[in-house]
Curated annotation (Swiss-Prot):
Keywords: Amino-acid biosynthesis, Aromatic amino acid biosynthesis, Isomerase, Tryptophan biosynthesis. It is an enzyme of class 5 (isomerase). This is N-(5'-phosphoribosyl)anthranilate isomerase. InterPro entries: Aldolase_TIM, PRAI_dom, RibuloseP-bd_barrel, TrpF_fam. It catalyses: N-(5-phospho-beta-D-ribosyl)anthranilate = 1-(2-carboxyphenylamino)-1-deoxy-D-ribulose 5-phosphate. The keyword Nucleotidyltransferase does not apply. Its EC number is 5.3.1.24. CDD domains: PRAI (cd00405). Belongs to the TrpF family. GO terms for biological process: L-tryptophan biosynthetic process. Pathway: Amino-acid biosynthesis; L-tryptophan biosynthesis; L-tryptophan from chorismate: step 3/5. It comes from the Bacteria. Gene3D superfamilies: Aldolase class I. It comes from Gloeothece citriformis (strain PCC 7424).
Length: 220
């Protein structure tokens, strides 16, 4: 399973989180965010990471030219669009950055907003479904309504986000079947300051879920 830890701000924490098992790290490229990191900071962190770890830059309503420039400066392997980006803009980036993963993050408020997800199936590589907040775009700690997602099917990979933390992870994965999970505030002491004990606990819970899942498969 893909495990993305978002809001990395410190090189030593990024390296430690990758060593604990995270295969994807996220960097906030939004200046107004308390988790914001500059392109230079992102590059410094990336230089200390294992090569197989995916490095995702998170943007909110940034111009395509800015995104392309930051990817070139930093070595990001993916771009996550967390604002009001249209399918057309996503497609434009996909063409401009053919070797870069394009992730569209969508805040799910209702069944209707979930139906709108289909508009992006052809224009991105991956989807990320997050909790809705009227004023904030992500990292809120709010939990998405899992019942809305119960019947969700996607032809492309999707990540579950929205208020995930070690103590509710097993419950979420028992109800849903995402290709991966995304956590930020659920493994933090403060915005941008990751709690490595919580990250370790997260992987313990994930191992527990995998063991239970295998047991159920064998029973059937």
């Amino acid at each position: 399973m893909r495990v993305k830890i978002c809001g990395i701000t410190q090189p030593e924490q990024g390296r430690a989180i990758a060593n604990l098992g995270a295969n994807t790290l996220g960097f906030i490229c939004v200046a107004q965010s308390p988790r914001y990191v500059t392109p230079n900071q992102i590059r410094e962190i990336i230089e200390q990471l294992p090569p197989l770890v995916d490095k995702i830059g998170v943007f909110v309503n940034a111009p395509a030219t800015e995104i392309i420039n930051i990817v070139a400066q930093t070595g990001l392997t993916g771009v996550q669009l967390h604002g009001d980006e249209t399918p057309e803009m996503c497609q434009q980036l996909k063409i401009s950055l053919p070797d870069v993963e394009i992730i569209r993050a969508l805040r799910i408020k209702s069944s209707q907003s979930l139906r709108e997800v289909a508009l992006y199936f052809d224009s991105v590589n991956t989807l990320l479904l997050d909790a809705y907040h009227p004023h904030l775009f992500g990292g809120t700690g709010a939990t998405i309504d899992w019942e809305i997602l119960a019947q969700f099917k996607s032809p492309i990979p999707w990540l579950l986000a929205g208020g995930l933390k070690p103590d509710n992870l097993v419950s979420a994965l028992s109800q849903l079947s995402p290709h991966g999970i995304d956590l930020s505030s659920g493994v933090e002491r403060a915005p941008g300051d990751k709690d490595l004990d919580k990250v370790a606990e997260l992987f313990q819970q994930l191992h527990r879920w995998k063991s239970n899942f295998k047991e159920k498969l064998m029973e059937n």
